[in-house]
Amino acid sequence: MSAYAIIAASGVGKRMKLQGSLSKQFLQIGGFPVIYHTLSAFERSASVDSVFIATRQESIELLENMRDEYGFTKIAAIIPGGKERQDSIYNCIELIERQILDSGTAPDAILVHDGARPFIQPDEIDEIAALSAQYGACVPATKPKDTIKFISENDPGYFGRTLDRSRLLQVQTPQGFASKTLIQAHKHARLEQTYATDDAALVEEFFPEQHIRIHETGYHNIKITTPEDIHLAEAILAKLQSQQELTSSKKN
């Protein structure tokens, strides 16, 4: 099968409280930038043919240098992002649509991933891509560990009712969709100036008949959002590397 991946890497990282123009995608984990780990996973994916990155204008050269230094051969384009995450995704979608029109062929699925999620694994990417092609849409998720409550509608200083945790999932990326579905969802959103926090919400809005397949991943697929996440990420990386070394030694 064939899949394209869009990497959203334009985030400033306000909650990281970074100084100057430093982007959270370039913070170091295990001696390498966050975005390096992300791109490495997609480079090793068997199903992803091309990767399109939307980033800040001042980060384009950094990513081009990283592509050349580490031999990320699947990167098809590194382009400026937009004002919001959704605008950045749309910029990549426009480029992909032009490529589809020029070539006459479309990928079976398009995956959209947060650049600040460095620990998605190649086999997970392949599974999500396959399910997206089979069912039209697939989103990774994991079970919440904490009890979740509504805020009171009458007084925001108090809780409302408690949600049934057994029926809740924390949504992650990469989110995968049939090419036409994702492209059209973003076009509708652009036309109607509708914004959502993720791509699945746009598909839910404009293609309600499209059921979205759940693929449970794990707690390793975190998004780097706050300073505390860097320490957690170092621990996750160490565990993943230990597991990989153990698997490799067993094969040998």
Curated annotation (Swiss-Prot):
UniProt site positions, description: Transition state stabilizer: 15, 24
Under Gene Ontology molecular function, one entry of this record is: 2-C-methyl-D-erythritol 4-phosphate cytidylyltransferase activity
Q: Does the keyword Transferase apply?
A: yes
For this protein, the record's SUPFAM superfamilies field holds: Nucleotide-diphospho-sugar transferases (SSF53448)
CDD domains on file = CDP-ME_synthetase (cd02516)
Q: Where is this site: Positions MEP for the nucleophilic attack?
A: 165, 223
**Entry's InterPro entries?**
IspD (IPR001228), IspD/TarI (IPR034683), IspD/TarI_cytidylyltransf_bact (IPR050088), ISPD_synthase_CS (IPR018294), Nucleotide-diphossugar_trans (IPR029044)
Family annotation (NCBIfam families): ispD
- What family is it from? Belongs to the IspD/TarI cytidylyltransferase family. IspD subfamily.
Q: What does this protein do?
A: Catalyzes the formation of 4-diphosphocytidyl-2-C-methyl-D-erythritol from CTP and 2-C-methyl-D-erythritol 4-phosphate (MEP).
Q: What is this protein called?
A: 2-C-methyl-D-erythritol 4-phosphate cytidylyltransferase
